[in-house]
Structure formats: structure tokens, C-alpha cells
Amino acid sequence: MILLQNLSGPLGWAVLGISLLVIFGLIVMLISWYKKVPQGKAIIRTGVGGTKVAIENGIIVVPGIQMYEVMDLSVRTIEISRMKEDGLICKDNIRADTKVVFFVRINKEVADIKKVAQSIGCQRASDTATLRELFEAKFSEAIKTVGKRFDFVELYDSREKFNSEIQNAIGLNLNGYILEDASIDYLEQTDISYLKENNILDAEGIKKITELTAQQKVK
């Protein structure tokens, strides 16, 4: 009873005021420490408490003992071209000029985001130049391997199958990234002027083109 009487006096109001001020200060502090995740991105927090990933909501970052970086999870494109002298060699040794666009992004799973952050870094993870370094050779090899399964005319008439088999050849193991889609942007026969007669494969291709052209003239 005495305590309640004391709190009802000037001292009580002072204690209440200080308490409210402290609570208000804590709320303001927590709000300033709260980092909301931008759309299409993730926040990776390091420091005390270990590595934490926020994808949809937000996360508290305490200055001085914790740090954070933002990682872009949006889709990036990588275009692989095989043109002219480097045209894709088909099963019948006819070359094809082709451009394939790959749509790649970081997988929206905590384990994959951590893997990419630790191995590549948040800032470089979605940089187009970095993605080319990581995947250009793999994607180019997939195009080359799959293209060799088709004769040129079959390849030209079966773009969807060509596309599907390229994606299957690349697979799902992209070390934290995923191949979301691919698109055959351009596909035409390589001009015969770029083929080399002293190249065995090109010589076979020239022979095949000559035969097909002759057949078309007869028709």
C-alpha cells in the first residue's frame, strides 16, 4: 500500500516517465535495426548468432556485432552463340548458326543462398559477367553435345526437343543456382562460305549440303 502511495506521487510519475521513455527508445532501436527484405532479394546476416538468411519477411541486425548483405535473386540471362566458323556441328556434319538464351537465378532455398554467398559473395552472385564465368563452358558444351544428336533438318524442325534436351543435359546441379528456362533465339544453317574444305567434318557437311540442294532442285 505504501509503495502504491509513493508511486502515485511525483517520484512515481518520474519512474513511469522514465520507463515509458526506455520502452519507446527500445522500440525505436529495434525498428532501426530491422531490415526489410526487398522484393526479389534476400538478406544474409553474419556475426553473432551465425549466418542467417531472410527471404520473405525481414531480420534484426544489431550494429557492431552483426553485419548484413543483400543478394539479388532475380532471373539473369546468359546468351551462348555458336556462329560462322564456330557453328554447331550436327549429326550429318552440317553446321548450324545458333543462339540460345539461358535464364538462371539463385535457388530460393536457405542452404543454396548460403552456399552461393560463401563461395561467390553476395555482390557478385547475380552479376552477368560472374554467371558467364560460372556457366558459359557448361552451357556451350551442352549445346554442342545435344546438337550432335540431330541432323540439321531434324534440328531445325524440332527446336522444342532440342531445347528440352539441352536443359536435360545441363541438369539441376548448378551449385546453388537453377536453370529456370532456355530459349532458342536463332537457328539457321551456317553459310557454306564459312566451312573449310580441308576440315574433314566440314567437307562431309559440304557434301551433304550439295546432295540436299540437288534433291530440292529435282523436286
Describe each PLM feature range.
Residues 33-35, 73, 88-89:
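Transmembrane alpha-helical segments that serve as helix-helix packing and pore/cofactor-lining elements
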Residues 11-31:
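Single-pass alpha-helical transmembrane signal-anchor segments
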Residues 79-219:
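Elongated, amphipathic alpha-helices that form coiled-coils and helical stalk/scaffold elements used
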Residues 1-10:
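Short, strongly hydrophobic alpha-helical membrane anchors
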